[in-house]
Amino acid sequence: MSPASARSASESPSFPPPAATPEQAASLRADLADSGWGVEAVAALLGEVADAALRREIRLPALRAVRAALAAGPAPSPVAVLTALFMLGESVPVTALDAALPRTTAAGATAIGLVGEPDGAGCVRALVDLRPHEAVDDAGEVRWWVASDLGELVTGRALAPDHVLGVGGAGLTLAGLTPRTPVRTALDLGCGCGCGIQTLYLLRHAEHVVATDISARALAFTAFNAALAGVSVTGAPGAGSDNAPSSGLDSEADAASESGSNAGHLELLRGSLLEPVAGRRFDLIASNPPFVLTPPAVREAGLPLMEYRDAGGPVLPELVAGLREHLEPGAAAVMLGNWEHRGADSWREAVATWIPEGLDGWVIEREVQDPVEYATMWLRDGGLTSERDAEGFDAALGAWIDDFEVRGVQGVGFGYLIVHRPLRPRDPWRLLEEVTTSGQGVLGHHVAEVLEVRERLAGLDDDAVADLRPVLAPDVTEERHLIPGAAEPTVILLRQGGGLGRTIRASTVVAALAGVADGELSVGQIASAVVALTGEDAIGLRAEMVEATRHLIAVGFLTID
């Protein structure tokens, strides 16, 4: 048996994705809300140690805690039943599920596709992963229950090529990166990379959301999760796939308060990348595209294309280049991605060519992995491990290393890509940087502020900047380093508490500007005061302070009205 066929035999089976009518979804939502099954309730059930272990994909401590709770009395709590069934893959009695979901019942959960038929002992097992997701944003509290395919932690098998991910680290990173300014239209490009979680967040502040994916299965999960959140859905997520039945969601579902009040309307379209939205423009695009750099030789060694992450070739250059035709004036696209390192600044040179002419581009590299680290991570992500299949793992890893060596790839960078269309034609700005620090708070707010203030700065000449009366941002602190006994500091650092958590080594000019920027004095007045104190050249110092002002405003250290 070839490595590919051996791996296929060990993959998790793909059950049809769940599908619910608006009435079924409303009943299930009400049951879940009444059950008290939330993030904090699960943590309390498991205990701190077991909950932390489960987040590290160590299942046993959580199983022990849940089994103890189920055996504690004749009527186990709904939280214990639902956690055991949907998060840990345990079988539970039909009677226990009937009690936990009284409106839906076990029979209804089977009809929806959440659980299988009862076994001879009168117990059922989950066919999908379902778990609570909670957060707080500008619109208030978020309380959802999100379905996805069962992970290998439960199945003990490698993931199927059409596997639909749950809410994971990458999805939450993108959700935090995305600006939440109210918009008319938004696009979730590739909603399968996280079971539609970006779609749900976009519906919080967009009047109309379009979600696309090449996978009918991913669209079906997105449709189900949207219905469970009380969202109106149009489209046929199951079209063209016997494994993804149509959701039947063509009318507006009743939105419960627990859904997070998703008032927007959702349209689902199937197709690759930007093809399904040809000729359409949006005010915001969010995407975690299938950017993994999987060489053909690796697939020949037995690793199949995973729909949620692999496109069969480098996808980001084509995707980013095509954004120009799909962004309204003032709109932005935010996405996650990776790129190859072949020299000192090679990644900047390569990625800069992706950004379309006339658009602003901001690329933030957050991490770099060496070739072995990168390949190992994605092999394990797909369920191919040395413990499970040493021969197959070594063959795939060797093919990956060979490909990188032949092409001179020294590492792979991970980070964020933000592309912005100016409100009016102008010279675009480009910033490609390495930032590994993080500030407090949600990064999406910072992204929105940076795009807005850079748009404003682009329309100001130096005289206009000199007339500004900036204010030091409230999250900025100053740090001075002095040699003992010295009167003056040798180093002055400005630290940003929010945003990207940047640290700037301040020159005399920058320190003076930050020290008195309270909105009372203009930049020009501050420059004149520094000249009077230091005797430096007035023209040169003013120019330096104007340039420093532009930079400090652009990165969020200074604010302007």
Task: Go through the PLM ranges and name each one.
Residues S2-V81, V154, R424-G515, T559-D561:
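Acidic, low-complexity/disordered tracts enriched in E/D and polar residues
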Residues S5-S10, G230-G264:
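Intrinsically disordered, low-complexity terminal tails and inter-domain linkers enriched
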Residues P16-P17, A25, D34-D129, L150, ...:
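Hydrophobic alpha-helical segments that drive targeting, anchoring, or assembly
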Residues P78-L127, T173-G176, R502-D561:
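Long, charge-rich, low-complexity alpha-helical segments
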Residues A121-A186, C191-H205:
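SAM-dependent Rossmann-like transferase core, predominantly class I methyltransferases
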Residues L159-A170, R180-P182, I197, I214-D242, ...:
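S-adenosylmethionine
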Residues P371-L451:
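Flexible, glycine-/basic-rich loop-and-beta segments that form/coincide
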